[in-house]
Amino acid sequence: MLDEFERGKDWELLTRFAQAYRSLSDELMDQITLHRSQAMVLCKLFAQDGMTQSEIAQQLAVQGATVTDMLQRMEDAGLVSRRRDLEDNRLVRVYLTEAGRDKERFIMEQFLKLEGAVFAGFSESERALLRQLINRALDYMDLKA
C-alpha cells in the first residue's frame, strides 16, 4: 500500500503531465490559430456535422454556456454556422463552414505531433497499456462524478 508521501507524488506527477500536455497542445494549436477547445469542437463536427450545441457540450463534458460562448467566437471567425433545426425549432445545429472544413488536415497534423511527443520512446505494447490504464482511470473517475 502506498504511504501518503508516495500518493502525493502521484498527484504531483499527474498534475505535471496534465500541465505539460495542455501547454504543448496549446502551442501546437496556436500554430494554426486555434484554441485547443475549438479544435476539439471542430473534430466532433468533422465526425458528425450538424450536431446540436447540447450534443457538443455533452461529448466534450462541458457546460452548455461554455459551448455557446465558444461557438460564438468560432462563428465570428467563420469556422462554423449555427442554424435552427428544420424539424424542431428549439434545437440549434452547428455546421462546419468551408473555412472550418479546411482546418481538418491541419488539426489532425497537430494532434499527430502531440501524440508523437507524448508517446515518443514507447513501444506499441506500452502505448496500448497506457491507453488501457488511462481508460480505466477515466471510467473510475466517471463513477465518482
Language-model regions, residue ranges each:
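Short, locally clustered residues in the helix-turn-helix/winged-helix DNA-binding domain
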Residues: 15-18, 43-47, 108, 135
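Charged, amphipathic alpha-helical coiled-coil/dimerization segments
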Residues: 22, 72-135
